[in-house]
Amino acid sequence: MVHSRKFRGVRQRQWGSWVSEIRHPLLKRRVWLGTFETAEAAARAYDQAALLMNGQNAKTNFPVVKSEEGSDHVKDVNSPLMSPKSLSELLNAKLRKSCKDLTPSLTCLRLDTDSSHIGVWQKRAGSKTSPTWVMRLELGNVVNESAVDLGLTTMNKQNVEKEEEEEEAIISDEDQLAMEMIEELLNWS
């Protein structure tokens, strides 16, 4: 087994074939991409899967270029065994098969210092999705002893509490957990 170049997501089996797999960023599970004759072919499969899952922010083995249609693809020095479109469709099917939930997401508490907001931030899986704020609370500029230590004005705090009560009936379990995290952080002294 001679490793002339190590590729991300690629390993060589004892008998010489190359395999590729990728870890799903939100599900924290490995997705099997297949067995290949060369390390380069396995690396191209990894790159296509990374682009499908992470979009233009993907860490790839080969340079990524924009096509005329506006989609990302890996710059291919050698002709691949499959066309980029058919490879993309195959990998997309494998990724869908590995995900029981079609819209997995990562939700976390985040502080936006640029616009003085604290809130719940969510990133859904997929190359075409972008991170969004689920809920934001505006932090006040003046620190008030009667308000929360983070500087929420009492008026903003009352408005937020009223909105929370109205929306509480329709909030999912994941969102409810995120709201509790915000509440604990705001009430923490």
UniProtKB/Swiss-Prot annotation:
Q: Which SMART domains match?
A: AP2 (SM00380)
For whether the record's keyword set contains Transferase, the answer is no
Q: By its UniProt entry, which Pfam families does this protein fall under?
A: AP2
Q: Where, subcellularly, is it found?
A: Nucleus
Question: Carries keyword Transmembrane helix?
Answer: no
State the Gene Ontology terms under molecular function: DNA binding; DNA-binding transcription factor activity
Q: Name one GO cellular component term.
A: nucleus
Q: A GO biological process this protein is involved in? A: ethylene-activated signaling pathway
User: Where in the chain is the DNA-binding region found?
Assistant: 6-63
Name the predominant localization.
nucleus
What keywords is this UniProt entry annotated with? Activator, DNA-binding, Ethylene signaling pathway, Nucleus, Transcription, Transcription regulation
Tissue-specificity statement: In flowers.
Quote the function comment for this protein: Promotes cuticle formation by inducing the expression of enzymes involved in wax biosynthesis. Probably acts as a transcriptional activator. Binds to the GCC-box pathogenesis-related promoter element. May be involved in the regulation of gene expression by stress factors and by components of stress signal transduction pathways.
Please state which protein family the record places this protein in. Belongs to the AP2/ERF transcription factor family. ERF subfamily.
Q: Which PANTHER family match?
A: ETHYLENE-RESPONSIVE TRANSCRIPTION FACTOR SHINE 2, SHN SHINE , DNA BINDING / TRANSCRIPTION FACTOR
UniProt name for this protein: Ethylene-responsive transcription factor SHINE 2
Name its species. Arabidopsis thaliana
Lineage, highest ranks first: Eukaryota, Viridiplantae, Streptophyta, Embryophyta, Tracheophyta
Q: Which gene encodes it?
A: SHN2
